[in-house]
Each structure stands twice: as structure tokens, then as C-alpha cells.
Amino acid sequence: MTFIRKPAGQAKPQKYSTDAYGRPAGKFRRNGPIRKKVCRFCADKVEIDYKNLSLLHTFVTEKGKILSGRMTGTCAKHQRELDTAIKRARMIALLPFTVN
């Protein structure tokens, strides 16, 4: 009876994929697993209004750029409404286009 041996250099499959530094890639961060961002407009039933400047300022960078939905966690529907509200507020000079 003959036994077939595995080659010595064959590695075991890992449970999680790792990056170049041996850390888990994409599944974990330093304090635990990555949480999915929840759309605050869907969760709290908040209406998006172009006159609500305190709300709109949280979705604009200090340079005046609109933050993406990936950064803020908003869903696609509310991101579109947010974009139009910010653009309306800019057109009637409630928000600046750029910061000097």
C-alpha cells in the first residue's frame, strides 16, 4: 500500500484573507468588526430641506465639496435628495460654493 504525500511547501487555507502586513483584510478594524453604516434619514425619518443649514453643513467638507454616500452612510435615494438640497441652498446663497 502506498501513501501519497503532500508537497512540503503547500500552505493551509486561511480563515480570513490578509493584507501585506498579515492583518485581516477588510473584515476587521482595530476595535472589532466593521459596522455597516445606516442611513440616518431612513432610520430617523428626517426630511431633507434646503433651508436646514445645520443638517446640510454636516454633509459638506470644509472646502465646500459634497460628501459621498459611502463616507456618510446615506442610501442612494436620500443621497440624491441631499445633493439637490445642497445645490438649491448654494443657488440662493445659503451655502457657499467654495470656501476662500
From Swiss-Prot:
Pfam families: Ribosomal_S18 (PF01084)
GO terms (BP aspect): translation
Region (Disordered): 1-23
Keyword S-adenosyl-L-methionine tagged: no
Keyword terms: Ribonucleoprotein, Ribosomal protein, RNA-binding, rRNA-binding
rRNA-binding recorded as keyword: yes
Disulfide bridge positions per record: none
One GO molecular-function entry: structural constituent of ribosome
GO cellular component, one term: cytosolic small ribosomal subunit
Primary role: Binds as a heterodimer with protein bS6 to the central domain of the 16S rRNA, where it helps stabilize the platform of the 30S subunit.
Quaternary context: Part of the 30S ribosomal subunit. Forms a tight heterodimer with protein bS6.
Entry similarity comment: Belongs to the bacterial ribosomal protein bS18 family.
This protein's name: Small ribosomal subunit protein bS18
Provenance organism: Endomicrobium trichonymphae
Taxonomic path: Bacteria, Pseudomonadati, Elusimicrobiota, Endomicrobiia, Endomicrobiales
